[in-house]
Amino acid sequence: VKDMQVQRGAGTSTNGAGAFGASVNMQTEGASMKPYAEFNGSYGSFNTHKETVKVGTGLLNNHWTFDARLSNIGTDGYIDRASVDLNSYYLQGGYFAENTSVKLIAFAGKEKTYHAWGYATKKEMEDFGRRYNPCGEMYTDANGNKHFYDDQTDNYLQKNYQLLFNHTFSTAWNLNVALHYTKGDGYYEEYKDGRSLIEYGLKPFTIDGTEITKSDLVRQKKMDNKFGGGVFYINYTVNRLNASLGGGLNQYRGNNFGKVPWVKNYVGTLSPDHEYYRNKSQKTDGNIYLKANYDLTSGLSAYADLQYRHIDYTIDGNNDKYDWSKNALRPLAVDKKFDFFNPKVGLNWNITSNHRVYASFSVAQKEPTRNNYTDGDPDSYPKAEKLLDYEAGYTFANQWLTAGANFYYMDYTDQLVLTGALNDIGEALTENVPDSYRMGIEIMLGIKPCKWFQNRPTLVR
């Protein structure tokens, strides 16, 4: 990542179709015009280390560049057994002409992380130390020593491909098109003790005349997902007008399923690929927007951003949660369509070279996430959220001082808020609240008394 920007409020259409609240815009590394080779390494506590190798050809034949990077990050972890092993690569090839550029990018990452989401209690930390990790605990032997499951890990591999096209038609017109595809495969594995066999589609078995309905077992929750699509925008700039027409069409397809590779003392035939739940998802997301900034007079400008977005979202199959009232896995039958119109307008007035005031109004709407559906009540699926964002502010800037205040009022309908509950891997659960709001003031101050020192504190109330 070359650059990362965080924008408060309702994000602009350029930064993503689903911008709701603050948005993050990340820019990948640009091509280097000069050849280079670089190695970076670091080492710290708990065997924490990072190694990166970067090489690049520079500009070849006045048109071509190629860049590559390999990296590894690892640690034993402060928490017991909370080890991490991360590996990634980045490849980039580019063609550059006077008015056109084409870049092909491929990058991937692989991770293996031992679970540390079990949240040790205060009593456990008093008994076993602050670094105690209950995840993967199997049993305590006769000497009082706890034994843990070695493969209590999260494993994921993701591959990404991007094709970026840029063309400048004239001083007024330019076009950007990006195609992308992502393939992900992963699973997490965990040891579970005393689990009911029926939850996993397994029949009770008999040992020495005793029927066994619960047993220790190992389960894997897996995912296989694909995400692809394209985005574009065409920009027009002339005199006092800067306008863009853009949009995108993307589709996500995913399979989530669970397997039980081992059951303690199991009597009977247990397939190594015994599957106990499966569901598939498909989400098609299309959007189009028109945005413009116009200089009304010297120092005074107005902007508008009008976006329409449509989503088709389906999830079909069984959840991984067992419904004891019905003696069956919870079904998933989501078939939702969303249509959102998200307008944004604003004014900016540079009173002088030092003083600036601004005001804006934005609408942002967002569909529930997959977790909102799978962790929620199957008889009452969550609703889409809507935000009306009102903001106004003032900034002052000169050579050594910047200061400003931003007032905001955010009016929500059906906001998904934290309930305080957690799901089985420690993620926070949410539910819709019919009406809610946030309001406050952000005070910013920047001091730069000399070239080599600056300080930028921020106060939010």
Question: Which residues does each predicted region cover?
Answer:
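A beta-strand signature from Gram-negative outer-membrane beta-barrel systems
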Residues: 1-38
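Transmembrane beta-barrel wall of Gram-negative outer-membrane proteins
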Residues: 36, 43-74, 79-116, 164-171, ...
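Transmembrane beta-strands of outer-membrane beta-barrel pores
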Residues: 41-47, 59, 72-76, 97-99, ...
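Outer-membrane beta-barrel proteins
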Residues: 42-50, 71-96, 136-166, 215-229, ...
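Repeated loop/turn-to-beta-strand initiation elements of outer-membrane beta-barrel proteins
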Residues: 63-66, 99-104, 172-175, 240-243, ...
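Acidic/polar loop-and-plug regions of large Gram-negative outer-membrane beta-barrel proteins
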Residues: 94, 101-162, 189-216
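Structural signature of Gram-negative outer-membrane beta-barrels, strongest in the C-terminal barrel
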Residues: 98, 248-250, 276-412, 448
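Gram-negative outer-membrane beta-barrel transporters
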Residues: 298, 409-411, 431-461
